[in-house]
Amino acid sequence: MVGEYVRLTPAGKGRLKGLCPFHKEKTPSFQVDTEKGYYHCFGCKASGDVFGFVQQMEHLSFGDALRKLADRAGIQIDAKYGEKVSRDLYEVNAFALDYFRSHLPGPALDYLRGRGLSDETIAAFELGYAPDGWDGLLKLARTKGVSEKQLLEAGLLTENPENGRVYDRFRGRVMFPIRDHLGRLVGFGGRVLDDSKPKYLNTPETAAFKKGELLYGLDKARSGLGGGAELVVVEGYMDVISMHQHGFTGAVASLGTALTAEHAQLLERLGAQSIVLMFDQDGAGLKATLAGLDQVIGAKFRVRATSVPSGKDPADALLAGDDAGIREALAGGLDEVKYRVQAATEKYGVDTNEGKRRVLMELLPRMQNLDPLDAIAQDMRGAACELLGIRPEALLDWITSKAKRRTLTDTHLAGMSQSSGEEEHELALLRQLLVDPSLLAKLDGSLPWRNEAVRKVMLAAQGARSPDDILDIFRGQPEEQLLIRLMFEGRDSGSLSRASSQEYEQKVTTYAAHAVDDIQVTLNIDALKTEVDLLKKQLLSTPPAEQLALLSQIQELQRAIEAEKRARRGS
């Protein structure tokens, strides 16, 4: 058994030696005792029996190693070590594979060659063809002593429920044999040569074929896991085969499903250290990627997500000679946080409050876990705060409150936001108006409010005589909490003496009046600066002949800014 993995030479009675497969060395220090059935390396100290050797070489559990050795020896093991699968089920699949491979020459072979596959690759992946007839496999089985029951159990026949007649399940299809991670032939996938539907057809669920637990190509790709090779999960059989042919030998594919929790558990058990999800850029591909990311939450391996830059699937990209595009996609894969944030941003945008709301709700399921050990959730919250300009403490308050179950309003967002300088000035102005609403009459009605909550209050507060009048307007609405906070802040200026209640009220009102004047000047300056910035950007794309007029406008605005500043200093 060891000799299948290590080149061994005699080293004395009952002993063989070779280069250790578990560490790099130039002089053989690995020995096998053929009489006792043990191995030992004098270099890295690895040792054990045949089961331990297979476990370590193949990254298998004891049960999987036992099944592999039992299959090799032709022994059927007790069901407690694994699923109860009759050995002849695998043999029936092998019989069908021989039948399919014998019918490959012809249109099916031409199709595969046309997809860029070499004859060597076609042979390595054991591709075949199911003839377009109703009972070709069934007729052959009858001559070879394979029963209808066995074919039905293997999912190779379909029974008509009305008349009980059986016929071949796979007809007129290129056949892809599907092996589990131990290399056992558990089923097939079939693809039509034309555009008829369904394009793909798999073996139905059987004792051996569990679609949610299988990854096509894993029997070949797993050999690199011991050296830390990265697995690349793609969408289809042809993607896997083309990737392997072009040297991307870590490619595997799920069988028409997104990555599942069972897949994640299997990959962990096999010692996977890193995987990349490389699905198509369409809506289905995005959905499969996000679903796959959901299933590997908490996995011990690193997960990234990417897609081919050209928008093609890997097989078509490689057929077009775009090996570089595949390498670029693999090199540029995004971690879970960056991928989710990018996907949500591209889907909804963050230029509007509606877009921000949708992005936040999209990210909520993954960032609401407050377990300190969930680093991804923490990073997701940090990314959301940075992207949307949200205060971290405000985001946590929202996540832990019932508010997250409601639709986010503009005011919710405003309350969570890290306000810009202009918005801070607007909130400061509103703070003072809550001290004395009559000061509202002093405001320039042309001011463009940036903060949505401020805009709503300013419009609704016209004619209010007291702060209570304003609060009554927004009683029970999202703006109420913001107004209460600002009202307390406006009256607690800190620098005002509270010698007497009457004197305090006079000082607060006087302070508020001066503050309104000052803040209004600041807002005017902010608005002028915004206009200057827009004109400067416009200047970069303006023909030289038209730049003089823009420069003149910029100079005039800058003079207006200086005039506002002088007015403030003189007041």
UniProtKB/Swiss-Prot annotation:
PROSITE patterns: TOPRIM. It comes from the Bacteria. Keywords: DNA replication, DNA-binding, DNA-directed RNA polymerase, Magnesium, Metal-binding, Nucleotidyltransferase, Primosome, Transcription, Transferase, Zinc, Zinc-finger. GO terms for biological process: DNA replication, synthesis of primer. Its EC number is 2.7.7.101. Mg(2+) 2 binds at D280, D282. SUPFAM superfamilies: DNA primase core, Zinc beta-ribbon. One of its GO terms (molecular function) is DNA binding. It catalyses: ssDNA + n NTP = ssDNA/pppN(pN)n-1 hybrid + (n-1) diphosphate. One of its GO terms (cellular component) is primosome complex. Monomer. Interacts with DnaB. Contains an N-terminal zinc-binding domain, a central core domain that contains the primase activity, and a C-terminal DnaB-binding domain. This is DNA primase. The gene is dnaG.
